[in-house]
Structures are given as C-alpha cells and as structure tokens.
Amino acid sequence: MAFDDLRSFLQELDDHGQLLKISEEVNAEPDLAAAANATGRIGDGAPALWFDNIRGFTDARVAMNTIGSWQNHAISLGLPPNAPVKKQIDEFIRRWDNFPIAPERRANPAWAQNTVDGDEINLFDILPLFRLNDGDGGFYLDKACVVSRDPLDPDNFGKQNVGIYRMEVKGKRKLGLQPVPMHDIALHLHKAEERGEDLPIAITLGNDPIITLMGATPLKYDQSEYEMAGALRESPYPIATAPLTGFDVPWGSEVILEGVIESRKREIEGPFGEFTGHYSGGRNMTVVRIDKVSYRTRPIFESLYLGMPWTEIDYLMGPATCVPLYQQLKAEFPEVQAVNAMYTHGLLAIISTKKRYGGFARAVGLRAMTTPHGLGYVKMVIMVDEDVDPFNLPQVMWALSSKVNPAGDLVQLPNMSVLELDPGSSPAGITDKLIIDATTPVAPDNRGHYSQPVVDSPETKAWAEKLTAMLAARK
C-alpha cells in the first residue's frame, strides 16, 4: 500500500494495532519526549504514539515514533508487520532497482488551505513546540524534510535535494539549521554564498513515511529523492508546487515553510541531544528566515525523539543506510554479498564479500569509507567472508574472535573525515578510521594457519525445516 500522506499511514498503523492513542492530559515537557523515549525501552513491536490532549496547547495533535519499530517500518513499506528485518532490507534493495519512477504532479494540496506571510508569521502559534531532551538549547524541528536546489543548475530535477536536518526554532519566523558538510544542502549553500546570494528552501512537516525514509537516505548528488520514493512505493510519488519558491514539495504534507538560508550569516545553535547518544554543543550555524507558511487545517505535528540508541532514528536510518551503501559497493565490487550499517547512522558497518585475491576485502572496506555516505559516517568497517551473515551478530562475533589477529588484521587510516557530531572525533570532524579484516585469507595473503572449515551437513537444512514445522504444529 502506498501512503500519500501521514494521515493514511497513521490509519494503517492503527488498523494493525501499532498506533497508541493517549487521550489523558499530558505535559508537553517532559511527557511527550519521555513517552517516545520509552518506546525504545519496552521491547519489540513498539507502537507509534498519538497525543491530542496536551496541557498548554489549544487543539494540538502530535504524532511520534511512527517508524520506531520493525513492525512499523514494515508497514511503511507495505509489507506484513511481522516481516523479518532482512526481508525488509532485501525488499528495499529489490525496489531500488526500479529507480527512477517519475513523480506525479497533483493540484489542490491540503496544505494550501491556510497561508500566513511575512511579519504575520508566528511559528509558536502554528506548531506545538517542545524540547526533546532536558539539555536541548531550544525547540527543534527534527523530522521535517528540507528541499533545496543547486543554484548553478536550478532546473535540474535530480539535483533538487530532499533531506532531513535538525532545525532550532529561534524566533517567530527564524530558524537555525545545521547543514552537515557531507550533505547536499551544504553544497547548495556553498554555491549560493560564493555568489553572495541567499539559498531558497522549502521545509515540509508531517510527511508520509516514504519521503521521510528518502530524506534520510544518502543518494548520489544527482539522484532525485522523489524518483527514488516512487521506486520504493512502487508508484509515482505525488508532488505539488510550493507557492513562494516554486519548489517541488510533497503533496500530502501537513505544513510547508518557505524562506531562505541567509547568506554568510551564522548564529549559535544548540545544544541538542543527538543520534550518537550525546549532546552536541552550541556551534555557529546558518540562519533561516521564513517568509511564507502554508498549512492544513488542524495540522498534525510529527517529531522524532533522539537519544541513547535504540530510538526511532535507528529504525529510520538503519535500512536507509544499508541499502545505498550496498548498491554503491555492489556496482563496483560484484563480490559484495551484504551490508549491515544499522548501527548509529552507519558509523560502524559490517560487510560480507567474496574475495578475488589477497587484500581484496580491505579494498572493499576502504571504498565503503569513501562512498557519499561513508565520507561522513563510516568510521569502522568489519569485513567478513561471504558465508557470514552481517545481520547475524553471533556469526560476526565468531568471525572476529576466530579470524582476527590484531598484529596484521587491523588497518588504521589517520586523519579521515567524519561528521562533526561524532563525539570521538578530534578535532570535531576528523578521526582515524579502522578496517577490521575478519575474512579468511586467500593467496597471496598467507596470514594464519587455517584448516578445512566445519560446514553444515547436507541434511541440516531439511532437518531445520522439519523441526520448525513440528514446533509450529504444537502451537
């Protein structure tokens, strides 16, 4: 099932028993964030949360944790809620090959029902804002998609970027936005500022799950998130034209903010509790001026809790990181079998590969670190043989414990790039990277003294199926 907006997705979650509606009166702080945080502490199958009775707000509706479990992630892809994680990633990979599917332009978006312009804008009146962690420096929009275009090639649809970036609400029509240098919006901004120009942007809030997944997926610079969203949902993605910027925005969004990142203007933004499980301190970041707001009558505000993993961001980013890394590596190294980059935005990746010759696995690990996503995120790579499933952690631990000799199997690369939010980087944005080679050596590599490996007998698979069927029959 393809969802055209957040509301249809919430209804589907509700139909599957994966939306918990909380009708009792709650405080905006700390209850909303604490409840979303708690979903990561109650075991598998955590539901999405819906709040519509929030003390201090008038007629506010807040949704959280919408993709915050593997069940919800499966539903977002139109799969059965019980689809295994590996099945979800395999399906993501299969649909990726449908790219590109051109979007469908639609008229009369619901977000056009109400508009506010210029000095009449007051985001505090329109959005039910609240802090996500006690140490946050302010209110944040952290699940919105930001649309920007290449100032030197504005008509190139593929170079129009849709990405998710944290934004601090700093005034009635003023935001602070963090453009991570490795992300496309940072390149757009750099090109605009070189010309002494502001960078127009459109910010979309309350989106369907597929464009949210795409906003978190590291595509190539000229790959369209809307065309990839069509591939992922297996039907053309619905877009509409934003009235001020003329940008392409999701037809089904709840709220559209349009304005500019002001050229060469920086102010302190932060701190903010980040996906690393640590606060990022205050830093000089860009300033956004909002010039037009369009919003649906009685809009739904969606927010994303971040903190000590696992939280919703890990379910959102996990497959969205594994799949592009796999596709980009597979295109250059057909020997690559699978990529597990589900941990902390892919700061750690586990990659299984066949080996053409000695040293091959290390070359694959190095390439993973220099993909579009790897430049800023892939800090450590564990390379394993093709018969080791990167998603089966006991198998990975076996490979690490039985195949790694620290004397020769650790490749340390000094002074490499990483996003500044990595608390281990020093200075912020620079780190040593590490490849751990847990593969069996092939000629001319002569590490270790490996004998014939123990493998399953031919009858094991049949017996596994038989025992599984017998257990199922007892229930």
Give the ranges of each region predicted by the language model.
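Extended, highly charged
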Residues: 1-272, 277-287, 291-475
